[in-house]
């Protein structure tokens, strides 16, 4: 018994949400859903019973276009996250590997460019993640998804260069 289901949860599969900081991104409906978060989605929860698991037959990405007046806006909102949700649909969770995905994304970006698609390019940016501890210490982590990229930083407000500290 039961009904088949296509999984399309708001926190992972809505491509009309911001995928980079709202201050630098085109206006969207709201929400925040990064490439990494989209890729991390497991449509078949590990704690689901076998009856539920057998009825999960796919995933779906959603994109409401009321904040995307042009094709360039739509490209930016949809890509590269659509590639991540697609891989989620055909790859079992235990075989997914974000580092491998990022390595393959370099070629996917070249393919998108050749087709005239204008994706969000924050894949190539340095992301700054912060987390406050219970002791009141602010931890800062820098990351980029671009394979092999080196991150240089300064602590005195100057623009980093290859002569700055290597992260």
Regions found by a protein language model. Name each.
Residues 92, 96-167:
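Short, compositionally stereotyped local motifs that mark structural "simplifiers"
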């Amino acid at each position: 018994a039961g009904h088949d289901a296509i999984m399309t949860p708001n926190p992972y599969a809505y491509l009309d949400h911001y995928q980079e900081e709202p201050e630098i991104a085109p206006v969207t409906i709201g929400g925040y859903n990064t490439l990494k978060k989209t890729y991390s989605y497991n449509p078949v929860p590990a704690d689901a019973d076998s009856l539920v698991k057998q009825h999960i037959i796919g995933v779906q990405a959603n994109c409401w276009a009321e904040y995307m007046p042009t094709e360039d806006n739509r490209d930016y909102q949809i890509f590269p996250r659509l590639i991540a949700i697609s891989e989620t649909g055909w790859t079992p969770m235990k075989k997914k590997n974000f580092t491998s995905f990022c390595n393959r994304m370099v070629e996917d970006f070249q393919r998108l460019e050749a087709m005239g698609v204008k994706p969000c390019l924050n894949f190539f940016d340095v992301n700054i993640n912060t987390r406050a501890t219970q002791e009141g210490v602010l931890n800062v982590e820098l990351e980029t998804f671009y394979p092999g990229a080196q991150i240089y930083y300064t602590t005195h407000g100057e623009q980093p260069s290859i002569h700055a500290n290597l992260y």
